[in-house]
Amino acid sequence: MNNLAAVILAAGKGTRMKSNIVKVMHPLGGLPMVSWPVNTAREAGASNIVLVTGHQSEKVQDFFEGQSDVRFAVQEEQLGTGHAVACALPALLGFSGMVLILCGDVPLISTATLKAMVKQHRSRHAVITVLTADFAQPNGYGRIVKDGDGFIKRIVEEKDATDAERRITEINSGIYCVESDFLTVAIPNLKNDNAQREYYLTDIIKEAANLGLLCQAFPVADPAEVMGINDRAQLAEAGQLLRGRINKALMLDGTTLIDPQTTYIDRGVRIGKDTTIHPNVHISGDTEIGNNCLIEPSVVIKGCKIGNGVTIKAGSVMMDAVIHDDVAIGPMAHLRPGTELKEHVKIGNFVETKKIVMGEGSKASHLTYLGDAAIGTNVNIGCGTITCNYDGVKKHRTVIGDDVFVGSDVQFVAPVTIGRNSLIAAGTTVTRDVPPDSLAIARAPQVNKEGWKLKKK
C-alpha cells in the first residue's frame, strides 16, 4: 500500500507514570512503547511515517535514527490532538492517499486490525474511518455519536458530553484512517472552544458529517488492542498481553513453553522447533535459538546466537555469545560478550567466560574464569583455573593449543601461549610459554615435617 502514510502521536509527557522518562520510551516487550505502533503501521503498509514528538524529543528521535521511513515533527506546546496532527502536516506535503493516525501510548493495536480497517475504508470510499470499541465502563473515553443510518455524526469528549452521551458505550480509540486531501483542509479549521481549550482531532468528524462525507466506525474485535497506557500498572498489564501473543506464536510454531505465563521472550527473538523452555526464562535482544534445545529454569539470554541441540542448565546468564551445536552450559554459568563455544563444548557450574573462542570438544567443568583467550580443540580446563588477563593497565591474551590438559588450580599469567598436547600440572602458575608436548609444573616442593603438630601442643 504505497498510498498509505501514518502519523504517530507521541508528544505527551505522561505525568501519571511518575517518571523522569517520557511515557512513550518506557520499555515494553524489549522495545520502547512507541516503537510498537510504529512497527505495526509499517507492517500494515505505511511507507511514510511521521512521528510527532514533544517531551524529551531528542531521546525519542535518537531511537529511530537510521529508519529511513520515519520522519519527525515536534509539538513544542501540547495543545491537543488536532494541534499535534497540524504539526505533522508539513511532513506530509506532496502525499496523497490515506493517513493512519495512531497513538504512541496505544501499543497493542495489531497489524491485522489496521489492515482490515484500511481495507474497509477503501472499499466504502469513506473519508474518515474511526476504530471504535465497546466498553461496559467507558469512563474517560470519547463517545461515538451516530445518525439513524449508523454513520458517525460526531465524537464527543467525556468532559463535554451530556448525560445521555455519557451513557453511550461505543468509544473512540484514538485511531483513525483519514483521506489526506480532507485532512489538510479540515485541520486548519479546528477551534479550541471546549472545556479543555484544546484543538480536538475529533472535531474533523463533525466537519465531514456536515459536508455530507462518509464517516464510519470500524469496531475492533478485541478491545484490549486499544488499551491506552497511562501508568505503570497499565504498562505491566500491556506487557502481560504482549507476552501472551509472543509466546502463543512461538508455541504454534513448534516451541514448547512449560509455563508461558512465567516465560519472558521479547519481540523478534527466533526459536527453532522442538526446543523446550522452562519457567522464569528471560530471552531478549537479537537472539536466535536453534532446534532441539533445552533451556532450564531461571536462565537469562540476551543477544545470543545458539545452535541446535544445546542444553542450558538452570541459573545461567548469557550475553552476546555465539554457541554452536550440541553444547552444554551450566548450571550457574556466566557467558559474557565475545564468547564463542564450538561444537560439543562443555561449560559447567560457576564458570565465567569473556572474549574467548573455545574449540570443539573442549570443556571447563567447574569454578573457572576464562577471559581474552583462544582455546583449541579437546582441551580440558581443570577446576579453579584462571586466565590472569589484566595487568592493571591493559588486557592480555592466553592461547591454549589443541589437546592440552590443564590440572586444577592453575593460573595463566597472560600473555602466554601453551603448545598443543601439553600438560599443565595442578597448582601451577604459568608465566612463560609452554612448548608443545611438554609438562609444565611451577609450585613449591612439598615438605612434610613429622611430629610438628605434636610439638605445637
UniProtKB/Swiss-Prot annotation:
Residues 254-457 are annotated as: N-acetyltransferase. It is found in: Cytoplasm. Keywords: Acyltransferase, Cell shape, Cell wall biogenesis/degradation, Cytoplasm, Magnesium, Metal-binding, Multifunctional enzyme, Nucleotidyltransferase, Peptidoglycan synthesis, Repeat, Transferase. GO terms for molecular function: glucosamine-1-phosphate N-acetyltransferase activity; magnesium ion binding; UDP-N-acetylglucosamine diphosphorylase activity. Coiled coil: none annotated. Residues 1-232 are annotated as: Pyrophosphorylase. Acetyl-CoA binds at N389, Y390, S408, A426, R443. Signal peptide: none annotated. Its cofactor is Mg(2+). The active site is at H366. Residues 233-253 are annotated as: Linker. It comes from the Bacteria. Gene3D superfamilies: Hexapeptide repeat proteins (2.160.10.10), Spore Coat Polysaccharide Biosynthesis Protein SpsA, Chain A (3.90.550.10). Its EC number is 2.7.7.23, 2.3.1.157. Catalyzes the last two sequential reactions in the de novo biosynthetic pathway for UDP-N-acetylglucosamine (UDP-GlcNAc). The C-terminal domain catalyzes the transfer of acetyl group from acetyl coenzyme A to glucosamine-1-phosphate (GlcN-1-P) to produce N-acetylglucosamine-1-phosphate (GlcNAc-1-P), which is converted into UDP-GlcNAc by the transfer of uridine 5-monophosphate (from uridine 5-triphosphate), a reaction catalyzed by the N-terminal domain. In the N-terminal section; belongs to the N-acetylglucosamine-1-phosphate uridyltransferase family. In the C-terminal section; belongs to the transferase hexapeptide repeat family. This is Bifunctional protein GlmU. It comes from Geotalea uraniireducens (strain Rf4) (Geobacter uraniireducens). The lineage of its organism: Bacteria, Pseudomonadati, Thermodesulfobacteriota, Desulfuromonadia, Geobacterales.
